[in-house]
Structure formats: structure tokens, C-alpha cells
């Protein structure tokens, strides 16, 4: 789904989401509806469609870490950087008005656990606009990536000043 959605293969993504909606317990009706409007926005780039996708993703993001990550990637691909950072702050830093629910009754999600943050999606083509934003440096510091890079003696990933 993600590869199709973010490489312009919108019809393939629509087929995948429809298949998942009927055959998977992992995708919720909220996710299906959010992806539907988001795929339209990714395809048309029409400001009205983007506004609808932004609203759907903002509504869905606080419901689960998975919906938050998808919202961030979608909004990054749509270059809705401010909204994406609002969701990032809620998911990874537990700050702001869009804090993601992380306890589903099965214990807290690892998505926002400082000991095991899942952040690979920050380094996908869909989130390039987020890495280009000046806030990426402070985010990298706040979630421990900058310290990780420094401690390992490796250069920072894309979007950070080197040295």
C-alpha cells in the first residue's frame, strides 16, 4: 500500500486498501476512509482534496500509532509539513494537541517508547519535506537520533548539518 500510494500508483493502492478492508483484521474502517480521501489528494493535488485529507488524518492520528505514522507520511507527501509535525510531536514526544493513544489494552505501544522508537518512516521519500524542515534537527535531538549518530561516529542522516 505505502509503495503504491507514494509512487503514484494510486489505483493499485486503492485495490490494496479495498482488499485489506475485506480480508484483514488489521485495517479499521477509519483507516479505509482516511486512505480513501488521502489517495484522492495524492492523485489530484487539488487544494480542496488536500484539505479533506488533512482533516481526515488529523482526526484519525490520535486513535493509534499506526494511523499516526500513515498520517505523517501522507501529510509529508502532500507537503502539509506543519500538520505532520503536530502529529509527530504527539506520537514521538507526547506533546501538543494530537497526542496518540498508545495503550490499546495490550500495554503501551513501542512507537513512542524512548527505548524502542520506530522511526524508519521518517527516512522515506514520502517524508522528504519533513526532513527538509528546520524542525527536523530539534526532533532528531529530542528523540535521541542526533546522540545516536554522534555516539556511533557516523554522519547524520539526510536533513541534518554535518560535523
Annotate the PLM regions.
Residues 1-163:
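Alpha-helical protein-protein interaction modules
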Amino acid at each position: 500500500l505505502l509503495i503504491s500510494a507514494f509512487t503514484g500508483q494510486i489505483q493499485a493502492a486503492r485495490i490494496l486498501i479495498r482488499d485489506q478492508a475485506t480480508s484483514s483484521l488489521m485495517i479499521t474502517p477509519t483507516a479505509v476512509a482516511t486512505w480513501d480521501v488521502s489517495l484522492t489528494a495524492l492523485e489530484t493535488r487539488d487544494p480542496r482534496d488536500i484539505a479533506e485529507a488533512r482533516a481526515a488524518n488529523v482526526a484519525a492520528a490520535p486513535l493509534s500509532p499506526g494511523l499516526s505514522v500513515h498520517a505523517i507520511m501522507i501529510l509529508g507527501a502532500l507537503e502539509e509539513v506543519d500538520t505532520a509535525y503536530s502529529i509527530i510531536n504527539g506520537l514521538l514526544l507526547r506533546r501538543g494537541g494530537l497526542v496518540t493513544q498508545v495503550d490499546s489494552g495490550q500495554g503501551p505501544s513501542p512507537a513512542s517508547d524512548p527505548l524502542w522508537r520506530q522511526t524508519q518512516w521518517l527516512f522515506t521519500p514520502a517524508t522528504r519535506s519533513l526532513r527538509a524542515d528546520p524542525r527536523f534537527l530539534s526532533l532528531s535531538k529530542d528523540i535521541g537520533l542526533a546522540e545516536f549518530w554522534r555516539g556511533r561516529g557516523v554522519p547524520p542522516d539526510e536533513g541534518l548539518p554535518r560535523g
